UniProtKB/Swiss-Prot annotation:
Species in which this protein is naturally found: Canis lupus familiaris
Name of the protein this chain belongs to: Steroid 21-hydroxylase
Gene3D superfamilies reported in the protein's UniProt record: Cytochrome P450
Gene name tied to this protein: CYP21
Positions bound to 17alpha-hydroxyprogesterone: R231
Residues annotated as binding heme b: R91, K120, H363, R424, C426
Amino acid sequence: MLLLGVLLLTVLAGARLLWGKWKLRGLHLPPLVPGCLHLLQPDLPLHLLGLTQKLGPIYRLRLGLQDVVVLNSKRTIEEAMVRKWVDFAGRPQTPSYKLVSLHHQDLSLGDYSLLWKAHKKLTRSALLLGIRSSMEPLVEQLTQEFCERMRAQAGTPVAIQKEFSLLTCAIICHLTFGDKEDTLVHTFHDCVQDLMRTWEHWSIQMLDIIPFLRFFPNPGLWRLKRALENRDHIVEKQLRQHKESMVAGQWRDMTDYMLQRVGRLRAEEGCGQLLEGHVHMSVVDLFIGGTETTATTLSWAVAFLLHHPEIQQRLQEELDRELGPGASGSRIPYRDPTRLPLLSATVAEVLRLRPVVPLALPHCTTRPSSISGYDIPEGMVVIPNLQGAHLDETVWERPQEFRPDRFLVPGASPRVLAFGCGARVCLGEPLARLELLVVLAQLLRAFTLMPAAGTLPSLRPRARCGVNLSMQPFQVQLQPRGAGVLGRGQHP
């Protein structure tokens, strides 16, 4: 019986492949990369960029039973995602996406529709509410508390990645639930860590490439389902508490706002009504998209500054000049980047070299379209190679080097695409940029960053499956500025 089932699935897969080829006949398609060994490359975004030398900035790859189009230049990415955004606003619905998204109620993983547009409007309005009211002072307050905790560890090796992760999780907890209690922060932090670790496992990635594998035993899939049950239990508890205590017409946080708006907000006529499940998944998106991504970018920034102490010194001089010496005092002028040009340029350079999501989540065409003269049929999966676009030698001078000064000359360098662009641009970009500027500014005002035991962290991305461009674990020593002696264990 098992053999018969395998044979049937093989026949169906072959029929689907032949049907797909028949539908593409007569089209002027991008060139196809033969074979599938490219998927085994440890640094896939750079490998995909290298293929442009022979094939140009747009080509097709064979991914399981289907072809996908890869975009490797800023020009092709913006043509698709900005100028033809409706054509490329879709999202392919893979087995893991369906499972993680609470049956298509997620914003990041949801397919393009009128209901999706209403969901986006709800989440964006809640974020804008946070920016107008409490977001800015909250980030500064929690960052100041973070620096005080770090001061207690001065002179000893600090696992800064975990500290950044807890800080960003505390910010999201407070904005979403109006609470930064340590127990809740650690609960959500551990939940997100477990979910991302499970979702990025190779067995789940293979399930999305070859969907019929879901009919076979998969321990990785079982672990993912348990992680999702834990996630939903935690979020549902918070939603239930908010519904029991909120006052109509008033909102304490983003969850209050979304719960009260979800019953009334509709998109264009005929889209249907948003459900509480959409609020549930907006909360999930805020934690998954707003904690590890920002924390990882901050960790990359610290690593680059450890390798480039001359840049760190210039940043501290800029901060002292504009804000005055000391770890507190003047607020960070994040709304006016001209006051802290080197800090803004450093953030841009870190985002260019190490976009946390180097290969953007796959898009899907909603109707037949074209890119650079090539036909792109309806339903085609399209993947923007953001890191590849940031390392394009035809656009950037010496792209592999860490050179924040490239952004100091107005108009000399294009805007980075680390947060995507078009209809699918990251809604949390304003919050992420605020956190990056405030945390780095306060950290560098309070401390000088030094390598633990004189060992510099690796700047090579960690080889792993998944979405995020993670880094090797490392430690840093924080020397309080103005301290007359070196901290314990510090090397001159």
